[in-house]
Curated annotation (Swiss-Prot):
It comes from the Bacteria. The gene is fmt. The lineage of its organism: Bacteria, Bacillati, Bacillota, Clostridia, Peptostreptococcales. This is Methionyl-tRNA formyltransferase. It comes from Alkaliphilus oremlandii (strain OhILAs). HAMAP family: Formyl_trans. One of its GO terms (molecular function) is methionyl-tRNA formyltransferase activity. (6S)-5,6,7,8-tetrahydrofolate binds at S109, L110, L111, P112.
């Protein structure tokens, strides 16, 4: 089968690797344009571009797909199928209708829940116990197409968004392999989504990581887990930004001002919340290394009674 692959970040690499290893003819890879990054503003290739070039696959990096020349390029490649994984651009109707077998997408949630760009983070932030991968046919709506396969996984109680991301990107490749097998054998029974059950997972912003201490300890812990590795949950201690990387919920009937440091132990900081106590175990101040509270307290002080967030 002749396939065009569209993807950009690290999450999209295992699916491309699987297609290459399975012997499909990848006639072209579409990925986002290179972006400058770092102090020298050096142009960085996307992870998908790196993988495609390593296998001598033609790479296309249009700023938009809504362009006649781009449409002609795609048409000339004569794809039987277009596979889209975290590409970062909306496909216009003309492209969706081009391949014989349509366009399919690998999405990192159990649709119709968590449509959008940030499903991996939001399932953890919202305290979900399970998530998974859904493959679907694409239509003009955002993640609204008919579903092909779903595979479910449990979310670990301590699992971070970064760890879940790495698990799901490999699961995505497995589910894509099964999906393409069904397409090749003409065995697909696509299921429409129940749009009334849909939820949305918007892309994350830096401000999302700011901790509201009036929330319960478990809600704050979920925010911490769900924003690792980026943007990372943070608060303020004596005017300095303090990122929090690891925490534990301690059940308590204590009624205190949310955000108040109620105790400082040798390896943790105990903080009052809207419900229960949060034990902070790993922190990072601006310009400093991430470290355990035990190590931080060797040469620094955290004062009991201070209010975090001020």
């Amino acid at each position: 089968m002749k396939i065009i692959y569209m993807g950009t970040p690290e999450f999209a690499v295992p699916c491309l690797e699987m297609l290459i290893d399975s012997g499909h003819e990848i006639v072209g890879v579409f990925t986002q344009p290179d972006k400058p990054s770092g102090r020298g503003q050096k142009m960085n290739r996307t992870p998908v571009k790196e993988k495609a070039l390593a296998h001598n696959i033609p790479v296309f990096q249009p700023h938009t797909l809504r362009d006649t020349n781009v449409m002609n390029e795609i048409e000339n490649l004569k794809p039987d199928l277009i596979v889209v994984v975290a590409y970062g651009q909306i496909l216009p109707k003309a492209i969706l209708e081009l391949p014989k077998h349509g366009c399919i997408n690998v999405h990192a949630s159990l649709l119709p829940k968590y449509r959008g760009a940030g499903p991996i983070n939001w399932v953890i932030i919202n305290g979900e116990k399970k998530t998974g991968i859904t493959t679907m046919y694409m239509d003009v709506g955002l993640d609204k197409g008919d579903m092909i396969l779903k595979e479910e996984v449990e979310i670990g109680a301590e699992e971070t968004a970064g760890e879940l991301h790495d698990r799901l990107m490999h699961l995505g490749a497995q589910v894509l392999r099964k999906t393409i097998g069904l397409i090749e054998n003409n065995e697909i029974t696509a299921i429409p989504q129940n749009h009334s059950e849909s939820t949305y997972a918007p892309i994350l912003t830096k401000d999302l990581g700011k901790i509201d201490w009036s929330q319960s300890a478990i809600e704050i812990k979920n925010l911490i887990r769900g924003t690792i590795p980026w943007p990372t949950a943070f608060t303020f201690y004596e005017g300095q930004v303090m990122k929090i990387w690891k925490s534990t919920v301690i059940e308590s009937e204590l009624q205190e001002v949310p955000g108040k440091i109620i105790d400082v132990k040798k390896d943790c900081i105990l903080v009052a919340t809207g419900q229960n106590i949060l034990s902070i175990e790993e922190i990072q101040f601006s310009g400093k290394k991430r470290m355990g509270v035990r190590d931080y307290l060797v040469g620094n002080a955290i004062e009991k009674g201070n209010i975090l967030g001020e």
